Amino acid sequence: MNDSQRVSILSEALPYIQSFSGRKIVIKYGGSVMENDNLKNAFFRDIALLSTVGVCPIVIHGGGPEINNWLKKLEISPKFENGLRITDQKTMEIVEMVLMGRVNKQIVKGINKTGSLAVGISGLDGNLIQSRELGDGSHGLVGEVTKINPEILDPLISKGYIPIISSIGSTLEGISHNINADFVAGEIAAAINAEKLILLTDTQGILKEKDNKNSLVEKTNLKEARDFIDKKIVTEGMIPKTECCIRALAQGVKAAHIIDGRIEHSLLLEIFTNSGIGTMIVA
């Protein structure tokens, strides 16, 4: 890339930087980007850049692969049903240890190394994420969000800190739950009136034809997104991600994006370029 191209890119980004300065963007960090050092470092720099130009990023993370690694080290076999982790009390203790004590702090350290200031918390802090058992409780301590109490985030964001939130919630009685990070991100985005919800995934976005990379849906709306699910254009793991976006938009989030986290700087490409890189869903 020559100097002219660099200047052109900066020029293209300027109106987006101006538009989103001071706005909150909730980003779900997960998938391959968490396991590849180059992708991780690019993500940390992207978050730092967003913060530097005045955007207010809030990062929600899971950590499935890291949880599985620690379960295996402790000779516990991970168990799943319909894509959900079966979470007994012993597994829940490991989930909390890994997400809150290891994955969360690795993200904080990575962002802080760029010169920005991140603060790691979980849904337990300030009762940020209240939860209950999912469905009939057959998955154990897998939970769903009942309420978001975002007040703890306000002083962090107002002072320029970047909140990094692990997707653990609890009941008012103190029972912890492991919650799907996509849905946590969507509920937090709605609760804080975020400008955008962005899900980093291991797919390009919504494809009209499952195995056709050229069939990417670059922009769609709530009605079409629901139709994609009903007509089984969106299937398998993309269903909960799309549903999460639909729910967030229905609660007032202005735009939701499903993007390919396997591409370096995909976050900046989606936010600061005309063409974007994934699927944007609007109300």
Curated annotation (Swiss-Prot):
NCBIfam families from the UniProt entry: argB (TIGR00761)
HAMAP family linked to this entry: ArgB
SUPFAM superfamilies referenced in this protein's UniProt entry, alphabetically: Carbamate kinase-like (SSF53633)
A GO CC term assigned to this protein in UniProt: cytoplasm
Function of the molecule: Catalyzes the ATP-dependent phosphorylation of N-acetyl-L-glutamate.
The protein's name in its UniProt record: Acetylglutamate kinase
Localization in the cell: Cytoplasm
Annotated source species: Prochlorococcus marinus (strain MIT 9215)
Record-level Gene Ontology MF annotations: acetylglutamate kinase activity; ATP binding
The protein's enzyme class: transferase
Lineage, uppermost ranks: Bacteria, Bacillati, Cyanobacteriota, Cyanophyceae, Synechococcales
Residues the UniProt record annotates as site (Transition state stabilizer): K28, K241
Assigned keywords, A-Z: Amino-acid biosynthesis, Arginine biosynthesis, ATP-binding, Cytoplasm, Kinase, Nucleotide-binding, Transferase
